[in-house]
Amino acid sequence: MTKHSGLSRIELLQGTLDFIVLQTLRWGPRHGYGIAQMIRANSSDSLQVDTGSLYPALHRLERKKWITADWDVSENRQRVRVYRLTPAGRKQLAVERSRWEQLSRAIAGVMRPPAREGET
């Protein structure tokens, strides 16, 4: 982890990148660099996805038919692949979101002090 503005960057838990990419595409189609930038911006620079992780994740999601990709021309006139969430991807996002909420509650429970004997 590296330091940035006094906060340490958060390493993504294994398996969360797909969820984060699906969530990002929920807000609209984006090319790979745009996905990485949105993740970084929406996490206040805490999450930074490198291309060595992002593009394999995008290809994996495309193989699962959770996203589609089409060629387009970017604002600076370069050819880019634009990724979009599919209906199957929206369903999977709901599943992933539910899992994340369960995990968050479980971790929050572990963080609380244990109940004293006789307390409920």
PLM features: what roles do these ranges have?
Residues 23, 37, 59, 94, ...:
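A cross-family signal for key residues in well-ordered alpha-helices
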Residues 2-3, 88-120:
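Amphipathic alpha-helical dimerization/coiled-coil segments
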Residues 10, 51, 79-82, 97, ...:
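Short, structured helix-loop boundary elements
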Residues 1-15, 96:
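Intrinsically disordered, low-complexity serine/threonine- and proline-rich regulatory segments
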Residues 48, 70, 118-119:
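Short, hydrophobic secondary-structure boundary micro-motifs
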Residues 9-53:
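N-terminal helix-turn-helix DNA-binding core of bacterial DNA-binding proteins
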Residues 54-61:
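Basic amphipathic alpha-helical segments that dock to polyanions
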